[in-house]
């Protein structure tokens, strides 16, 4: 968008980066089974101790996401035409602490807002509802609650963690987004898809 997305935050208890790999044979099957990753993303941090998770109140954080996206748009039959690139989004987080568990929301905005599929599906901004895993633990999961438009299916999911050993000061994790349509192979655009996988970090 016009002003660009927020940068990844400069955090004290967590960090992130890119990684790459290539292999000429990744399978025991006959023949060469090549594989490669370019600009994969990772995030890691000092996990919050479970006994230091607050049992009341709330916290707000903000930051950004970096994802690797791939999509196929308005193609038919056996036309491959898959485009791949790296893109970003702004992220705002709210955590609501409870006595036996916590909930929250991740709000993603300006998410790949030039992609025709994401725009048509109304998914340039979406919310993910968070729930702590197995009670009061530093890890949580979430799924998107935003309605997808114009016949698209799919959504977003996250797996994240709270960072800083003594108090939840930062949070990060992985996100995946999937948008798709089903139809006959020879139908124009009927088998379009969009996938994105990456990370987010907030403080």
Regions found by a protein language model. Give the residues of each.
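Mature soluble binding/inhibitory domains
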Residues: 1-203
């Amino acid at each position: 968008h016009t002003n660009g997305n927020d940068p990844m935050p400069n955090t004290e208890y967590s960090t992130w980066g890119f990684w790459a790999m290539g292999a000429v044979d990744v399978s025991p099957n006959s023949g060469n089974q090549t594989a490669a990753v370019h600009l994969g993303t990772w995030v890691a941090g000092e996990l919050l101790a479970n006994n230091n998770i607050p049992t009341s109140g709330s916290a707000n954080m903000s930051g950004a996401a970096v994802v690797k996206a791939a999509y196929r748009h308005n193609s038919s039959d056996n036309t491959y035409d898959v485009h791949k690139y790296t893109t970003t989004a702004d992220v705002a987080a709210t955590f609501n602490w409870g006595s036996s568990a916590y909930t929250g929301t991740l709000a993603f905005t300006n998410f790949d807002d030039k992609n025709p599929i994401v725009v048509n599906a109304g998914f340039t901004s979406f919310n993910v509802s968070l729930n702590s895993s197995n009670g009061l633990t530093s890890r949580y999961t979430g799924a998107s609650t935003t309605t997808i438009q114009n016949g698209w299916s799919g959504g977003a999911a996250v797996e994240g963690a709270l960072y800083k050993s003594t108090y939840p000061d930062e949070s990060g994790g992985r996100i995946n987004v999937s948008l798709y349509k089903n139809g006959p192979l020879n139908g124009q655009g009927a088998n379009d898809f969009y996938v994105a996988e990456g990370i987010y970090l907030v403080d």
